[in-house]
Amino acid sequence: MLYNLSKAVLALSVLAASADAAGIRLEKRASTFDYETEMVRGVCLGGWLVLEPWLSPGLFDAAPDGAVDEWTYTEILGQDEAKARLIGHWDTFITEQDFFDIAAAGMNHVRIPIGYWAVEALPGDPYVDGQLEYLDRAIEWAGAAGLKVIVDLHGAPGSQNGFDNSGRKGAIQWGQGDTLGQTVNAFRKLAERYVPSSDVVTAIEAVNEPFIPGGVNEDQLKEYYQQAYDIVTQMSPDVDLVFSDGFINPTPWNGFISDSGNIVMDNHHYEVFDINLLRMSVDDHVRSVCDFGRTQLAPATKPVVVGEWTGAMTDCARYLNGRGVGARYDGAMGGESVGDCGPFIQGSVSDLSPDDQKNMRRFIEAQLDAWEMKSGWLFWNWKTEQGAPGWDMKDLLDNGVFPFPLESRKYPGQCG
């Protein structure tokens, strides 16, 4: 198919580019990306340098049941054993070839999550380090492939959302004690490493998914964002701060900090984590995302990138809701059952019925059209270890469910 042909053509340049990349060491900044005028089209490299059980279930299946996030994984296994296993994961889950495949698909960005503990773990933390060397390498590979990088502080001290993807599942304790100052310190060190020196890193994200509806104090969050903005703008006029809307949507942030440059809002849009959304038909999903583009993205006074979204319309992917936790869709979490999870749990999108594949393609196309009403998008995620239909962009591209070229449409004009 066209995507695989494009990969093959681009692969001819990999050896030469690899040789060039080997000599790159984050030198003086030269180029930028204009988030005000250019369209972001990219993908996240989740589950690599910050663990998530559903993206790399094999790591967790080989660990005791109490390992449900990176904190407990390293705590239970011990640092020596955990680091040995994680090095094996870091070496293989994402490689240089992935960056060339992403570029071959027509994308211009990757967003790379990293935890605060990779920069500087706190006393008493069980985490292991070593991730920054891989992030350095990833930035070199991205540059060789012609991609821009958003460095994403995905986990903050105390957990900013209580999700396993923050490093520690459970209560939100970000904002308590010294956690805000500790986050500023981690962010500053991350910025010092990449903002002044890499022409590949065009933006850095203050913190991933601070959960305002879950209890994060909005005033404290705004104070932190201001400090992060000052750190970045003092280091370089060519790098933007990315900040999450905190799950309160983009338009309430109009006028915050600056509407005139060096700042980008990150909105995450999923329609799978609520039973009412799971009940919706594909027509409903299409209308929903198109309406969101018109009412929340287009009127925003800053650039807004939908920095996480999916082709899935169920929450059936194994461990998506947490290790050992079932899905809402089939009633395993309690309450009504919308349908059978079946082939949506694990494996390839090619295992789905033709109708399910068509509906997923239609939903993906509608989202692409909606998100490009503003500043673009970053799909979650590039790959999964054991397959998660609808979430694995590489699998979606390989099976023609994600458009290639990105502008191609089987269902044009869905957003009017």
UniProtKB/Swiss-Prot annotation:
Alphabetic keyword roster: Carbohydrate metabolism, Cell wall biogenesis/degradation, Disulfide bond, Glycosidase, Hydrolase, Manganese, Metal-binding, Polysaccharide degradation, Secreted, Signal
Active-site feature positions: E209 (proton donor), E308 (nucleophile)
Reaction catalysed by this enzyme: Successive hydrolysis of beta-D-glucose units from the non-reducing ends of (1->3)-beta-D-glucans, releasing alpha-glucose
Cystine pairs: C290-C415, C316-C341
InterPro entries per the UniProt record, alphabetical: Glyco_hydro_5, Glycoside_hydrolase_SF, Glycosyl_hydrolase_5
Cofactor(s) this protein requires: Mn(2+)
Keyword tRNA-binding: no
GO cellular component: cell surface; extracellular region
Subunit structure: Monomer.
Summary of the function given for this chain in its UniProt record: Beta-glucanases participate in the metabolism of beta-glucan, the main structural component of the cell wall. It could also function biosynthetically as a transglycosylase.
Name of the protein described by the UniProt record: Probable glucan 1,3-beta-glucosidase A
